[in-house]
Amino acid sequence: MLMSRVDHCGNLAYLNSNNNGFNGRILGTNQTLEVAKELIEDTLNIHIKNIEKLKSLGRKTRPLYTKQDMFDMFEKMEVVPSYKKITLNEWVTIEFVNAGHCLGSSMIHLWIKKPNQSIFHIIMSGDMGSEQNKLIHPLAEKREQITKCNLFISEATYNKKSRSFNKCDVQKEFEDFKCTIKENLLQGKQILLPVFSFNKVQEFLILFYEWLKDEEWFNKNNFPIICDGVLMHKITNVFKRTLCDDKKDYFNEVCNWNKIKVNKTFDGTMAIMSKKEPMIIMASSGFMQQGRVVAYVKQLLGSKKGVILTTGYIGGEGSIGWKIAESPQKTVSIEKQVILKRALVKSYHCFSSHIQYDELESLYAGLRCEKILIHHSSKEDKLNFVNEMRKNTNKKIECVTDKNYEFIF
């Protein structure tokens, strides 16, 4: 397991269910596995609620997997330290190295002994982090520089140059982000940050602490920073347990800052919403489709005293997040309630933790390998990206599509 976000690991319990009978080992770094347990359990709870709702509507359906399947799957998890070669059998040796994307994220080296005894070396990237915005990713490990392999299987989320950013863009956007928060807090407004419970919340806690702990205007007004969500609290505790050495001590110092207020109950959410004083609220989830954030959005979006700042992917065209932040329409329908957009809504794009277009090009150009295979990337732009990279790097590059998903090497 290269990382713990649900789009990478959320269906593992299904493989372990009675229908599928997976009996293998699940290997990953300690941080990845610990976070994954929290995210998978939360995913299962949502899945079960969805099944119950479908049944109440008369649909015949059953869960893809059960809680017992999930716990049985957890028993198959084994911690593998980064930068330690592990021999799985006489044919395969692996090693996890830092991907720099989020807590515990890894790339994996696989050395496969072929029948003729030669070694075929594969590197699979998972999601890779960017060096362009380390300023706003204080916990990110430095991505390992890879130089040589036979096959590199690469993500390419930022496969359009027009979507990319550089260090200058990051600096300007972060300054605007801080100015927007300061200006609107001093105007008595409530600021909502829809965030994902994993990684984004924890990094914002550090960013706010480093920026605001000694700011006179902030401390004089005693503005609270609300962290609202059960899952974000559980994952923050994983960070407290699994960060190492100075990072662990510093993160615990941040979490003990008296301006941070943690809420884990819906009654607490209602109490927070009843207050009119200015504050910063971080609530999950980032897509604004469900979770505590929906209640805050419904209250703040229609108010001139509300501010909503998005700092990551908020869903595709037609989603609630897109309708709020990107659509020119003046109203949004949320849970059958039509809301006129009166709040200030701003989107920031440089907070992404993905490697950027120019960094991918530089990586591919400097990599000595027989083939690069583009895998994790948007379908509509993948082929254009591959053609551009072939031209710019003079490398043999292919991409996985629904037409050619089997490769022989």
Whereabouts are the PLM-identified features?
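His/Asp/Glu-rich metal-coordinating catalytic cores
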Residues: 1, 5-9, 13-203, 209-218
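A short helix->loop->beta-strand "cap" motif at the edges of active sites that frequently abuts
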Residues: 20-25, 187-189, 221-223, 304-306, ...
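Short acidic-hydrophobic, aromatic-tinged amphipathic segments that line or gate anion-handling sites
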Residues: 75-83, 259-266, 399-401
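Hard-cation-handling environments
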Residues: 176-319, 332, 375
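A short, acidic, amphipathic alpha-helical segment used as a generic capping/interface helix at domain edges
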Residues: 291-300, 352-367
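Generic long, charged, amphipathic alpha-helical segments
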Residues: 332-363
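Proline-aspartate-enriched helix->loop->beta-strand connector
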Residues: 364, 368-377
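Short acidic, glycine/proline-enriched helix-loop-strand junctions
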Residues: 381-408
